[in-house]
A protein has these predicted regions:
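Active-site capping/gating regions of soluble enzymes
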Residues: 1-118
Length: 118
């Protein structure tokens, strides 16, 4: 599923805590506790926002399910931009991809911090 976020054209965007709270609330009201996991799509969110939201969901609640990611664009976008079709940029792009994967792994464990992005 996607996370509960504000519409892309909304003049006011929900903060990280509100997105996490409303997404977890929605899951608690609609999913059985014996479901093993929920994996989220990034749903058009930025790389950092999708990571921050996942991390916050894992921090605010002891959920009966594992909350993780199934991101495509949110994992690949920065790496593709770094690569830009230039073979000379392959190593840098791989490092960018590896970093995003690591950040999302930490978010799935509720261990991500924004300072790790610098």
């Amino acid at each position: 599923p996607n996370m509960v976020t504000s519409g892309s054209t909304a003049s006011e965007q929900a903060n990280i805590s509100l997105v996490a709270e409303k997404t977890v609330e929605c899951l608690q009201n609609s999913l059985p506790d014996d479901l093993p996991a929920v994996t989220f799509l990034s749903g058009g969110q930025s790389d950092i926002d999708s990571t921050a939201h996942l991390d916050e969901m894992n921090k605010i609640s002891s959920n009966p399910w594992k909350l993780s990611f199934s991101y495509g664009r949110a994992l690949q976008q920065a790496a593709l931009k770094s690569w830009s079709g230039n073979v000379e940029n392959e190593t840098a792009a791989q490092e960018v991809f590896s970093h995003r994967a690591k950040m999302n792994k930490l978010a799935a464990l509720g261990e991500w911090e924004s300072s790790l992005e610098n």
